[in-house]
Amino acid sequence: MMTKTESLEKMREKGAYDAQQLQSKAAAGTVTQTEIIDEEIAVPAFDPKKDYSAWPVNSPVSDEDQVWLLLQPHNAANYEGRPSTLRALWGLAHTKNPAKAKPFVAPYGTSGMYMKDECILWTDGKVYVSVADNNVYTPAEYAQNWKLVE
């Protein structure tokens, strides 16, 4: 029988393996952003001291209740901020799964625009789905671009 310490070590190893597998699939483009968010438990947390220079583009991290995808490999210790404030380095992932909807984050230029069928969790606690591609508006700003998920 395993000790508690051994069990925890096995769980850490499994978590690291799952994170590496998801990172590989994301970098290869063999999973969608929806699938990445569906497997968010395997997404590593953003570390502001980590060197992401050797990480492949599209590798996911979680931060501030969002999943971010690496756009530009870099050493985070050389930058002040988080993915939400370093949008030239990190892109926002979106989901088409209403059960995993994330809070709305304003797009940054063309990065992070909401495409048709992508979902958000709005400030009223309700889930909305975009009915238009290249959607940069909130449900409050341009309601016709969003449909309430019942």
Feature-to-residue mapping (PLM):
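Tryptophan-rich substrate-binding surfaces of secreted polymer-degrading and adhesive proteins
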Residues: 2-150
